[in-house]
Amino acid sequence: MANHPLTLEKDGFIVTTLDAAMAAAQKNSLWYMTFGLARCAVEMMHAAGARYDMDRFGMIPRASPRQCDLMIVAGTLTNKMAPAMRRVYDQMAEPRYVVSMGSCANGGGYYHYGYSVVRGCDRIVPVDVYVPGCPPTAEALVYDLMQLQRKVAERSTHSRPKLFARP
């Protein structure tokens, strides 16, 4: 028998692990909801438009947090809006991811010293990827979303305890 790697064309089957299958499925089906609060939200709309087309990466916008596993926070987060953002995050499906887009969402930005500004959305929800810039370009958002996809694909089922927990 020849020493060759297993392929679908030669052997008629594919060998994989549950980790690899779950990672590939989840990586290519990130459904996102936008939490647009300022100018960065306009750049987020550009990324979802025809020129950059986030749909080709398997990222589909959803209106309900219960159908989403990715939240993109774009803009200045105020103290009054923080509880609403946390409530939306808690309603999202597990496993869930957060992208902080722009200087205001990352650390308060231009309004950092304002009395009503939260100095970074990572004080309210855990953030997986930060997109720098004021406002960040659509290219930067798409690049960081691809980095998030890589991060999701590298996770194993060991880090997803709720999905495979025994009753």
Swiss-Prot record:
Main location group: membrane
Gene3D superfamilies in the cross-refs: 3.40.50.12280
Keyword Nuclease recorded: no
Enzyme Commission (EC) number: 7.1.1.-
GO MF entries: 4 iron, 4 sulfur cluster binding; iron ion binding; NADH dehydrogenase (ubiquinone) activity; NADH:ubiquinone reductase (non-electrogenic) activity; quinone binding
Gene Ontology CC terms, in alphabetical order: plasma membrane; respiratory chain complex I
InterPro entries recorded: NADH_UbQ_OxRdtase-like_20kDa, NADH_UQ_OxRdtase_20Kd_su
One GO process term, biological-process aspect: aerobic respiration
Keyword Transport: yes
Coiled-coil blocks: none
UniProt topology in membrane: Peripheral membrane protein
Catalytic activity: a quinone + NADH + 5 H(+)(in) = a quinol + NAD(+) + 4 H(+)(out)
Compartment(s) where it occurs, according to its Swiss-Prot or TrEMBL record: Cell inner membrane
SUPFAM superfamilies: HydA/Nqo6-like
Subunit structure: NDH-1 is composed of 14 different subunits. Subunits NuoB, C, D, E, F, and G constitute the peripheral sector of the complex.
Main function: NDH-1 shuttles electrons from NADH, via FMN and iron-sulfur (Fe-S) centers, to quinones in the respiratory chain. Couples the redox reaction to proton translocation (for every two electrons transferred, four hydrogen ions are translocated across the cytoplasmic membrane), and thus conserves the redox energy in a proton gradient.
Family (UniProt): Belongs to the complex I 20 kDa subunit family.
Name used for this protein in its record: Putative NADH-quinone oxidoreductase subunit B 2
Organism for this UniProt entry: Burkholderia pseudomallei (strain 1710b)
Gene from which the chain derives: nuoB2
